[in-house]
C-alpha cells in the first residue's frame, strides 16, 4: 500500500459560510453547483502546477529554501521523483481537482545526455499514466523547461548557437510524445529566455524567425504522431531576460499573425505576467478573447508594489471577478482551457498544509469571481451600460459609420458647421465612481448569500 504523505488532511469539502476555524474547506467553490447552466467545475477546470506545488523549495535571492515536504527523506534523485508522483496524486485526490500541469524537467532529474534524461523521464511518466488509469486525473497541459539549464543561457529557439536550437528541438519532440501519452489537452510554450539582454548584439528578426520555425515544427510533429492538443503561447514581458519577444497578448498575437501561427495557436495568460506588462489581467483576457485566441489561464496574482514575478495564490476578489466576467462573456475559458495555479506559498508559509491552504484560497477566489460575474451578466448590468454608452451608433450618422456608408466627405459635410456647444451637449458623464460602487455591491451581496 502506498505511504500516506499528506497526513491529517482529509478530502477538502464545500462547507459554505461555516466558520473558517471549523477546518479546511471551500466557502465558494461547490464543484457540482450550476452557474448559468454549467457546473462550477466545468467553468473553472482547476489544475495544480507540478513545479510550484511539489518541486518549489521556497528559495529567494537572499535565502535558502524553507519548504517542509513529506517526501524530503528521499535523497536519491530518481527515488525522490517517483515518491513525488505518489504524493502528487494523493494531493489531487484530497484537493478534489481533475487536472494537473507540468514541465518535463519537473518530473525527473536530467542525465548527462538527452537519451539518459529521456529514460529517467519515461520511468516517471510510466507511473503517472498508471495513476491516471485508476484516478481519472487528466493533464490540462504539459510543456518543456528550456530556460533553467545553463545551455539555455541565451535562449532555446532564439539561441545564437545552432547546437542549442537542435537540442531544444529534440527535447521538444520527446515532450510532445509525452503529451500524447498522458492525453494532454493543451501544450504550452513559455519562452523564459526567448528575448534579449541587449539589442547591440542581437539579430531580432532572425531570432523571431527561429522561434516561429520551432513552433511550426512542433505543430507539424504533433500532427504526425496524432497528438491532438491545442497549442498555446504564454506572454511575459521580461524576467529572466530584459525583454521577451512575447511581451503581452497584443504583441504575441501580432507575432502569431506575422508568422502564420494564429490558426493553430492560442494564448495562455497569467495574471502576474499581465501586471509586469503594465496591464490588468482583465485587459489581457479581453484582448485575447476579442481576437478569438483565448486558450487557457494561469491563476495567480502579483504585488503592485513589487516589480517582479511573485506567483502568489490569487485572493483579490475584484481581480478574479473581472477575469471571470471575461470568461463568462466568452462562454468558457477556451476550447480546452482551464485555470492552472501557477502559484506558490510565501516563503514563511513552509508547512505541508500550506499547499492546501494556498489552493483553497485560489479556488475560492475564482469561484467567488464566477458567482459575482454571473450575477452581473444575468442582471444585464454592464451590458446595459455599454449599450447606452454607444447608442449614438444605432441611428443617424452613427449608423452610417457602423454600416460603412459614411466616408470622410460625408462626415465633413455633417460636422463642419456644428457648434462646439452641440458637440459637448452630446456627451454624457460615465459616472465611473457609481459603476465601481455598484460592482462592490455585487461582490458583497452575491458572496453574502
UniProtKB/Swiss-Prot annotation:
Keywords: Carbohydrate metabolism, Cytoplasm, Isomerase, Magnesium, Metal-binding, Xylose metabolism. The lineage of its organism: Bacteria, Bacillati, Bacillota, Bacilli, Lactobacillales. NCBIfam families: PRK05474.1, xylose_isom_A. It is an enzyme of class 5 (isomerase). SUPFAM superfamilies: Xylose isomerase-like. Belongs to the xylose isomerase family. Binds 2 magnesium ions per subunit. The gene is xylA. It comes from Levilactobacillus brevis (strain ATCC 367 / BCRC 12310 / CIP 105137 / JCM 1170 / LMG 11437 / NCIMB 947 / NCTC 947). GO terms for cellular component: cytoplasm. Mg(2+) 1 binds at residues 234, 270, 298, 342. HAMAP family: Xylose_isom_A. Its EC number is 5.3.1.5. Mg(2+) 2 binds at residues 270, 273, 309, 311. Homotetramer. It is found in: Cytoplasm. It catalyses: alpha-D-xylose = alpha-D-xylulofuranose. One of its GO terms (biological process) is D-xylose metabolic process. GO terms for molecular function: magnesium ion binding; xylose isomerase activity. Its cofactor is Mg(2+). The keyword Cell membrane does not apply. This is Xylose isomerase. PROSITE patterns: XYLOSE_ISOMERASE. The active site is at 103, 106.
Amino acid at each position: 500500500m502506498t505511504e500516506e504523505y499528506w497526513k491529517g488532511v482529509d478530502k477538502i469539502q464545500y462547507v459554505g459560510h461555516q466558520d473558517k476555524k471549523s477546518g479546511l474547506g471551500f466557502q465558494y467553490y461547490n464543484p457540482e453547483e450550476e452557474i448559468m447552466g454549467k457546473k462550477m467545475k466545468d467553468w473553472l477546470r482547476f489544475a495544480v502546477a507540478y513545479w510550484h506545488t511539489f518541486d518549489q523549495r521556497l528559495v529567494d535571492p537572499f535565502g535558502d529554501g524553507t519548504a517542509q515536504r513529506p517526501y524530503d527523506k528521499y535523497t536519491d534523485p530518481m527515488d525522490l521523483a517517483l515518491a513525488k508522483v505518489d504524493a502528487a496524486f494523493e494531493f489531487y485526490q484530497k484537493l478534489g481537482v481533475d487536472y494537473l500541469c507540468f514541465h518535463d524537467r519537473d518530473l525527473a532529474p536530467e542525465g548527462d545526455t538527452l537519451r539518459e534524461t529521456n529514460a529517467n523521464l519515461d520511468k516517471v511518466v510510466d507511473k503517472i499514466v498508471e495513476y491516471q488509469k485508476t484516478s481519472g486525473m487528466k493533464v490540462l497541459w504539459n510543456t518543456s523547461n528550456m530556460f533553467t539549464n545553463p545551455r539555455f543561457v541565451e535562449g532555446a529557439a532564439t539561441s545564437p548557437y545552432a547546437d542549442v536550437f537542435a537540442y531544444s528541438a529534440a527535447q521538444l519532440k520527446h515532450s510532445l510524445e509525452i503529451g500524447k501519452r498522458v492525453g494532454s489537452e493543451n501544450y504550452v510554450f513559455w519562452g523564459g529566455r526567448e528575448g534579449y539582454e541587449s539589442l547591440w548584439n542581437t539579430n531580432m528578426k532572425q531570432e523571431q524567425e527561429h522561434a516561429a520555425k520551432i513552433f511550426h515544427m512542433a505543430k507539424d510533429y504533433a500532427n504526425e504522431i496524432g497528438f491532438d492538443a491545442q497549442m498555446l503561447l504564454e506572454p511575459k514581458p521580461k524576467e529572466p531576460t530584459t525583454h521577451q519577444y512575447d511581451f503581452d497578448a497584443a504583441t504575441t498575437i501580432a507575432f502569431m499573425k506575422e508568422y502564420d501561427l494564429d490558426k493553430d495557436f492560442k494564448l495562455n495568460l497569467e495574471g502576474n505576467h499581465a501586471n509586469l506588462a503594465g496591464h490588468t489581467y482583465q485587459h489581457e483576457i479581453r484582448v485575447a478573447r476579442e481576437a478569438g485566441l483565448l486558450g487557457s489561464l494561469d491563476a495567480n496574482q502579483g504585488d503592485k508594489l513589487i516589480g517582479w514575478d511573485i506567483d502568489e495564490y490569487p485572493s483579490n476578489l475584484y481581480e478574479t471577478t473581472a477575469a471571470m466576467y471575461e470568461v463568462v462573456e466568452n462562454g468558457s475559458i477556451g476550447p480546452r482551457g482551464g485555470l492552472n495555479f501557477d502559484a506558490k506559498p510565501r516563503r514563511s508559509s513552509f508547512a505541508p498544509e500550506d499547499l492546501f491552504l494556498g489552493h483553497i484560497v485560489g479556488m475560492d477566489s475564482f469561484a467567488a469571481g464566477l458567482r459575482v460575474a454571473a450575477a452581473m451578466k444575468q442582471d444585464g448590468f454592464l451590458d446595459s451600460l455599454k449599450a447606452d454608452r454607444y447608442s449614438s451608433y444605432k441611428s443617424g450618422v452613427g449608423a452610417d459609420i457602423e454600416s460603412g456608408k459614411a466616408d470622410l466627405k460625408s462626415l465633413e459635410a455633417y460636422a463642419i458647421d456644428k457648434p462646439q456647444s452641440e458637440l459637448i451637449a452630446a456627451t454624457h458623464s460615465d459616472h465611473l465612481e457609481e459603476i465601481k460602487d455598484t460592482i462592490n455591491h455585487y461582490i458583497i451581496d452575491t458572496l453574502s448569500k
